[in-house]
Amino acid sequence: MAFIKPLLIRKHLAWMFFLLFFSCAQAEEYVAGRHYEILDSPSVTRDPSKVEVVEVFWFGCNHCYALESYIQPWKKTLPKDVDFWKSHATWNPTLKIHARLFYSAKALGIEDKIIPGAFTAIQREGRFLTGNSELEYFFRGFGVEKEKYLSVSNSFGVNNAVKQADNRMRQWTITGVPTLIVNGKYKVSGTREVGTDRLLDVVDFLIEKERRFLASSY
């Protein structure tokens, strides 16, 4: 029965080669230029000790609306060293109005309520949310009276937030939404290969890549 030992060795080696091949395939599952882009000029993140993920979106984008159903459960699973936040797109006057809506909600501390509310109003109810009276009515539904809404939406803080969002659009060369920027270095957008349901898989891959880099830097 001496042949048993060589047979076991061959099986063991075959299994090791399989694991090696599988791990390499996993490591190379997402590659630059195919699944994500490397930004020409990295941007400064708001907390260098964390891996930053910024979602550039628009309330009027149906793909952003679809992604939101993935974003909500996903962000609850993020490690403490990952900083996730949203930045509203600002290509044209309509988007800038919606950006002002978003940053007004942030200033009022009702961002988590307004996001699903605005998506529902625009995507499912067919509302535009662009006129003053329409926006006043919309915010009143969240307990914000007209005077308070007008004061906040025209404040220096909200004006500056919209301006900064516009600057980020230019800096990151955003041409479509949803787009996610990982740690100021990588841009992940929907493509034929990366659909809405896979965007966060690519982001997770890049998060781990940056977490390893940060860990090796300390």
List the predicted regions and their residue ranges.
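Extracytoplasmic thiol/disulfide redox context detector
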Residues: 2-93, 170-171, 205-218
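Polar helix-capping/helix-linker motif
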Residues: 9, 131, 154-155
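Solvent-exposed loop/turn segments at secondary-structure junctions
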Residues: 59-63, 90-94, 120-125, 157-158, ...
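Conserved strand-to-helix beginnings and helix N-cap segments that scaffold or border functional pockets
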Residues: 65-68, 95-99, 193-196
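Sec-exported extracytoplasmic/periplasmic mature domains
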Residues: 66, 72, 76-79, 106-110, ...
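Extracytoplasmic/secreted envelope proteins and their assembly/folding machinery
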Residues: 68-75, 98-102, 115, 132, ...
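Structural microenvironment flanking redox-active thiols in thiol-disulfide oxidoreductases
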Residues: 79-108, 112-140
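C-terminal cap of thioredoxin/glutaredoxin-like
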Residues: 141-218
